[in-house]
Each structure stands twice: as structure tokens, then as C-alpha cells.
Swiss-Prot record:
Function text: Required for the formation of a threonylcarbamoyl group on adenosine at position 37 (t(6)A37) in tRNAs that read codons beginning with adenine. Is a component of the KEOPS complex that is probably involved in the transfer of the threonylcarbamoyl moiety of threonylcarbamoyl-AMP (TC-AMP) to the N6 group of A37. Kae1 likely plays a direct catalytic role in this reaction, but requires other protein(s) of the complex to fulfill this activity.
UniProt KW keywords: Acyltransferase, Cytoplasm, Iron, Metal-binding, Transferase, tRNA processing
PANTHER family in the cross-refs: TRNA N6-ADENOSINE THREONYLCARBAMOYLTRANSFERASE
Example of a GO biological process term: tRNA threonylcarbamoyladenosine modification
Subcellular location: Cytoplasm
Organism name: Thermococcus gammatolerans (strain DSM 15229 / JCM 11827 / EJ3)
Name of the molecule in the record: tRNA N6-adenosine threonylcarbamoyltransferase
Binding positions for Fe cation per the UniProt entry: H107, H111, Y127, D285
Amino acid sequence: MIALGIEGTAHTLGIGIVTEKKVLANVFDTLTTEKGGIHPKEAAEHHARLLKPLLRKALQTAGITMEDVDVIAFSQGPGLGPALRVVATAARALAIKYNKPIVGVNHCIAHVEITKMFGVKDPVGLYVSGGNTQVLALEGGRYRVFGETLDIGIGNAIDTFARELGIGFPGGPKIEKLALKGERYIELPSAVKGMDLSFSGLLTEAVRKYRTGRYRVEDLAYSFQETAFSALVEVTERAVAHTGKNEVVLVGGVAANNRLREMLKIMAEDRGVEFFVPPYDLCRDNGAMIAYTGLRMYLGGVRFKISDTVVKQKFRTDEVDVTWS
């Protein structure tokens, strides 16, 4: 079977086409601004403007037509309301026009589910992006959140710190590069709050120290990264210990960071569990993960009426009954 998926929860519009074992197309376009940040209205306008050309490109890349598609999936949430509504409207229109079944997909779950295309069975997932930071795993028929940010996502924290340092947006690659030149660790407050995480205190103190002018930016970048990532690894390790699972996956845009990958790999080796990171185009927000998850849901018996496709801006990961996995 072939599924087409449309992703549009935030600033990236993605369209993916997959089978159960292969990505046939995975195209996207990201709204970028000089100062960073996303205005929901601008994201919606971006998605509406690019939907047709991206759909055309995806179909051409896959070498198929809409008639060949068996199921249409879309990101139902969580995300920015105006952006989600553009995507949902497009998915409904395609489903009705071509008489195809439609499936609404939880964006966070899709980030973990796509790893199963590569043979991952039942992992603990660390999902790290601009707006989201979660440690999740399948337990009792739902993806349970074992730890999450209580304030801002790790990606937003990194980007905000980068803006304070005056090194621009996106900040992730630039902070990572600066951190490689760090020579000493500067003490910063832990981001661990029980099983959850809070990056606001860490960010505030790092910015305060920078503004004193007494510290090298390379050392601050190194210290910020080490402190934040240590917290992520600690909470992930606790989830592994609690669940007894033997696989850890790293997904989301911040999965591009090599230091975070290294730290998680060390933890996984110490605990004797497998560690996996998908190709980066399947880590970031993308349509292929929506298509793949929608296909798995459909094959597992999940069915949606058009009336079930209302978007959910605050769609919780643990709301979904996972009957297909």
C-alpha cells in the first residue's frame, strides 16, 4: 500500500509518500525569518502557498499519481492552529476528491513511529525539537510521556541563547560549533526537575553570565550544551530503567547535534541497549513520518470519518490508543 502524508504543525510544510518499507518521496519547505520565531498566520500563509507545488513535486519524485495513493494522512496536532488547519483542509479535500481514506496523526508519535521502518521494535524515544522535548515510550497501549519540558523546548532554549550571543538563527549548529572550542565548564543550574525538565533557569543564568562579560562565549556554549544534554540523557536513562526496554531512539530537529548523539550512545552502551538515530530528513519535521504512521494506523484498523479530522492544537501524546503497534 502507498500512503501520502502532509506535515504542517509549525514552520515546516512537508509532504511524504511511503510504502510499509520504503520512503518514495519526502519533500519540504521551511518558513525562515531573520530573527527566528514563528508567527502562526505567516506559517499558515506559507503552507497554503506551497501546498500545490510541493504535492506536485512529491508525486513526481515518487513517480506516481494521486490515483495510486491508498490512504492520506495529515498532522492533526499538536501545533499552531492556523498552520494545522491549512494542512487538515488540504488532506480532506484530497480525500474527498480522490475518494481515499483519511487518517489524522499525532505529530509527536510519528517522530518515534518512523524509526520502525528501520527495524526498531519498541523503543524509549527522546524527542527534541524547537517546541517539544519529551521522553516517551509505548506502555499499556499508549505512548506514555515519562518526562517532558515544563517550560520551553530544548531547541527554543538553544536558539534563544544563540540570539543573546548575537550569532543568529538557527542557533543549534552555531552553538554546537562554538561548544567545540570550549576549554572549561562553567557551572550552570541543572535542568532536571524530577522526571521532567526545565530549561528556563539554565537559559536565564547562561544569559546573565554572558552579559557580565567575564566569560568566553565558547566556554558558555560548551557549558550550556553539556548541562542541557546531561539532563536529557539522565531523564532518558531513568525511563529506560523504568520500562526495561532495550532500544533508545533520538528524534526531532535537535537530533542533528553530534554531542547529544555521543552522550546518548555512551549511556546506551553502558546500559547494554541499542541506540538508533534515523537519517536527519526523517528526524526533522517531515511528511514521510506522517505518511508512515498513518499507514500503520490504517493497516491496524484505525478509521476516520471526515468529522473526526478536526485539528488539535494541544494534542497530547498519551491521548492516542495505539492499536496498530
